[in-house]
Amino acid sequence: MNIIKTEIPEVLIFEPRVFGDARGFFFESFSSKVFNEAVGRQVEFVQDNHSQSQKGVLRGLHYQLDPHAQGKLVRCVEGEVFDVAVDIRRSSPTFGKWVGAVLSAENKRQLWIPEGFAHGFMALSDTVQFVYKATNYYAPQSERSIIWNDPEIGIDWPALGDCALSLSEKNLQAHTLANAELYK
């Protein structure tokens, strides 16, 4: 497993070693030992989620507050997405900064988004199957959202002019970073 550091030290890209031949391919998609060594702490995942989206669907920027904060290990198993993590920890030197990565069925990369970050993605291909592990259960009372196009954050979403953007009503009503309930 190749661990790729991003501009925000806590957010990591996991790139598996893929072994292929005429029959297909094999790779180890998750190893608790490798993962915990890379993130520098013991992490326990309690829930796996799976979503399907069409091109232009933008989901996010979502997070859960304490005591239900979630870390997520995300990957795209069909198609391609642009995946984003935004640091929303007020005490962090990277507060308000974002990192993005293209995750696809082809590159098989995964992105680790720790607790204290908002997460979102945009579907870049006609069909996307997106799966992720979460460190805490879904808790609607702790769920919050930040608007996807907040100018203070300035996410450079790719291909915005290439397709019709599709967002949920909840995502359209999300707060700006300045007005959101955040981590300390």
Language model segments and positions:
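Non-catalytic, conserved peripheral segments adjacent to functional cores
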Residues: M1-E106, S125-T127, Y132-K184
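Conserved metal-binding segment of the jelly-roll/cupin
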Residues: L103-S125
